[in-house]
Curated annotation (Swiss-Prot):
The keyword Protein biosynthesis does not apply. SUPFAM superfamilies: 4-helical cytokines. Residues 1-28 form the signal peptide. Belongs to the somatotropin/prolactin family. Prolactin acts primarily on the mammary gland by promoting lactation. The gene is PRL. Interacts with PRLR. This is Prolactin. One of its GO terms (molecular function) is hormone activity. It is found in: Secreted.
Length: 227
């Protein structure tokens, strides 16, 4: 009986590891191979990749926030100051699935294309400033680097999706400008740590929104809301 249990446990662990590796490898795949000419990817495949990417980004951002919170901010009461102080708060976006379901899919796509580029600068500077932190855990830095890369890939994929769903639509140039770099470089430790905490809190919030929006959009556009 012990040998059967061991074989069964080993098989389950192997299956779990295989699924995790598949998810990570899919998330790291480019939309088109490097140097490809006239690359065509089906709308279903584009949405599949976008949903995997957005879920992966949200998972990483949640883990990074939790690691930073545990290491740097215990007992500082930052959560009470972080509410509604995100640089993307100026963008009108639904707060939950119920609100998102009331919005036309074209408007929801435009919202995604406003939020994603709003994170290009913050993520770039987040990586730079985390590198300069004393004793910054490798886990936090590696996640910041990966999120920055995957956010660019997701934006690229979303532009291709919009190109197929609404051909000829003008490129969306409306996004929220981030001006928080000086806060990440402040000499006062509490103020600087709060700036990092708030940025990671907002990243977790926005990545969760994007993840929900894309799952809803995939359900509507690919499965005609039958999911």
């Amino acid at each position: 009986m012990d040998s059967k249990w061991s074989r069964r446990t080993g098989s389950l662990l192997l299956l779990l590891v295989s699924n995790l590796l598949l998810c990570k490898s899919t998330a790291s795949l480019p939309i088109c191979p490097s140097g490809a000419v006239n690359c065509q990817v089906s709308l279903r495949d584009l949405f599949d990749r976008a949903v995997i990417l957005s879920h992966h980004i949200h998972k990483l951002s949640s883990e990074m926030f939790n690691e930073f919170d545990k290491r740097y901010t215990q007992g500082r009461g930052f959560i009470t100051k972080a509410i509604n102080s995100c640089h993307t708060s100026s963008l009108s976006t639904p707060e939950d699935k119920e609100q998102a379901q009331q919005i036309h899919h074209e408007d929801l796509l435009n919202m995604v294309l406003r939020v994603l580029p709003s994170w290009n600068d913050p993520l770039y500077h987040l990586v730079t400033e985390v590198r300069g932190m004393q004793e910054a855990p490798d886990a936090i830095l590696s996640k910041a680097i990966e999120i920055e890369e995957q956010n660019r890939r997701l934006l690229e994929g979303m532009e291709k999706i919009v190109g197929q769903v609404h051909p000829g639509i003008k490129e969306n140039e409306i996004y929220s400008v981030w001006s928080g770099l000086p806060s990440l470089q402040m000499a006062d430790e509490d103020a600087r740590l709060f700036a990092f905490y708030n940025l990671l809190h907002c990243l977790r919030r926005d990545s969760h929104k994007i993840d929900n929006y894309l799952k809803l959009l995939k359900c509507r556009i690919i499965y005609d809301s039958n999911c």
